[in-house]
Amino acid sequence: MGFIYARKLLLCMAVSIYAIGSTTTTETTTSSSSTSGSGQSTSSGTTNSSSSPTTSPPTTSSSPPTSTHTSSPSSTSTQSSSTAATSSSAPSTASSTTSIPTSTSTETTTTTPTASTTTPTTTTAAPTTAATTTAVTTAASTSAETTTATATATSTPTTTTPTSTTTTTATTTVPTTASTTTDTTTAATTTAATTTAATTTAATTTAATTTAATTTAATTTAATTSSATTAATTTAATTTAATTTAATTTAATTTAATTTGSPTSGSTSTTGASTSTPSASTATSATPTSTSTSAAATTSTPTPTSAATSAESTTEAPTSTPTTDTTTPSEATTATTSPESTTVSASTTSATTTAFTTESHTSPDSSTGSTSTAEPSSTFTLTPSTATPSTDQFTGSSASTESDSTDSSTVPTTGTESITESSSTTEASTNLGSSTYESTEALETPDGNTTSGNTTPSPSPRTPSFADTQQTPDNGVSTQHTTINDHTTANAQKHAGHHRGRAGGRRGSPQGGSHTTPHPDRLTPSPDDTYDDDTNHPNGRNNSIEIVPQLPPDRPIIELGVATLRKNFMEASCTVETNSGLAIFWKIGNASVDAFNRGTTHTRLMRNGVPVYALVSTLRVPWLNVIPLTKITCAACPTNLVAGDGVDLNSCTTKSTTIPCPGQQRTHIFFSAKGDRAVCITSELVSQPTITWSVGSDRLRNDGFSQTWYGIQPGVCGILRSEVRIHRTTWRFGSTSKDYLCEVSASDSKTSDYKVLPNAHSTSNFALVAATTLTVTILCLLCCLYCMLTRPRASVY
């Protein structure tokens, strides 16, 4: 019984505990919900407070709408944000987009202080708000003024059409801030643009907010500057914005980043633009993305606005109320320079970031029109780089031209000028490279004689210039040429008209680059050419007659050698001692083998303790392409006598030799497998030789052997094959073996070989002994095996 009572008692206790527990839970739930409600109200409060600072005194009235805004669906807030990002719209965005609340709130916080500061500075900004409202709509729609309604619908989807209206009011309150906040809101609102915006939100919050602050300071400056200056500044800003627009089209994120850069440049030079036309600054960052105030206007021609003439159009916009006119200037811009804009936009799109970076550096000249132009110029630099034929040269010219183009507000014109200069630069470099030879003229002595005969070491410019000309590209040549006296180019241009190309190895005009030789490895003209051209040219410099002289008594020394150590290739080396610019050519027989030229190197040799400048050309030809004993020629020709595909070797210094056989003459004797023949083979013969056979002490007559002659072939000299029949006799055991001697005598050499043929009888005896030994061994093994198998085994038991 006691056990039963205990069970009941425990059961009662359990039930009571359970009841108490459930009661507690209910209470907890209730408190939780109440807490949630309080949190909700707190959020609303925050929104209201944030909108108030942004609004500034006149905006205070719009704070209530802001509250409504907050209470309304978050999506609506997002739309509003597009219009005036600074407004509580940012917070609303946070509430609307639960995923990005933090980022939105951050942006709002930063933007709000900036907005408050900026608003007072820019009076015009207020009107901009109206434009901004349109922009907001655009931001939502992401590209059209008409989208206003659409934008509202989009933002309202969450549920707050009224909220959208309220937002408009708030926006009006924060025109200036709008530029900054707009980007943020856009991030929250737009979907397609949201990606852009989203990225922009993070970037905008930090970068964009900072921009707002900068804009404030910039705005002050703009206000101080005269309207004209502001217009100029605005022009720069607009250009930037325009560029941004293009970039924005490409990537919304870029737009956000651009906005940051834009404010920076704006702070210095475009600051006025930022404030005067928040639409401009905003348009820059927000127009594409969230369509800042200028979004509406920009929407009309967002890309065009980024257009090249943004400078011109914008100038008017800021001058007349940046607010209302903001839209108008946009249109004007569109009408004025849609084509140009388009052109610039394309190139700018990829280079937007670079352009803004440049603007940041240019910012020191904020109030001047030059600064504003600097931005476009930086942007433009990227544009022409795409179209310019020669990127390298254009870059050089653009660097020097940017300052000039900066003065002119027309971007297209600047591009034209830059290109023109580029082309002129190209010509200059061409002259430099092609007139290298002409520099020799300046090196001549007053009496008309050249300095080639000098035994003294070449002057410092000589060797490097020659080396550079040979081994570096054109740009290297032009660089090297700058070390030569400036009059070289003048002389080159002066005498360029006198020279005319001629067939048969005569030089063409240096201006046209006719120095090109048949083979790329050939040397190009050197400033130290020894010989002049055209014998038919009556008038030369210094009023002296120009005649192609025969090579002077001190002709360059040429050494030619052929190596035969390699089996597969014939290698030849030609060394020319000279201080002049020479081109080296090769011939085997009557055929040119320049295609096998391994190149020419420049070196210094010591002759009698004096350093001598020399050229070394190497030729490497497969033996299969070479017939031994053929004549090989190395020709060193003055570069000014080389033209077209032919070379007049009569005016060149040549060195010839005979290609030797690939190897040394050698003789070998071989015995046939059967031992019935002895063969003597001699190779690398220049001509058919005389052969003599000796067997033992007997010398065979000419009819005692046969011989075959194989003439010279590619890669192989003559071969002689001789054969002797071996007549066996019955040799007895112990008889001496026979020895064979083959002697081959050529015109310039004699070779021989000696071999001994073993005694055939002794060989048979050896075989017999070997066979006997093997047989006995096998028998022994068999016996052992038999014994092992037949041996009796012990019984197991």
Curated annotation (Swiss-Prot):
The keyword Membrane applies. Residues 495-505 have a biased composition (Basic residues). It is found in: Virion membrane. Coiled coil: none annotated. Pfam families: Herpes_gp2. It comes from the Viruses. It is a single-pass membrane protein. Residues 24-188, 212-549 are annotated as: Disordered. The chain crosses the membrane at residues 766-790. Residues 1-25 form the signal peptide. One of its GO terms (cellular component) is virion membrane. Residues 212-373, 395-430, 445-457 have a biased composition (Low complexity). InterPro entries: Varicellovirus_Gp2_glycop. GO terms for biological process: viral process. Glycans are attached at residue 590. Keywords: Glycoprotein, Membrane, Signal, Transmembrane, Transmembrane helix, Virion, Virulence. Residues 374-394, 466-492 have a biased composition (Polar residues). Virulence factor. This is Glycoprotein gp2. It comes from Equine herpesvirus 1 (strain Ab4p).
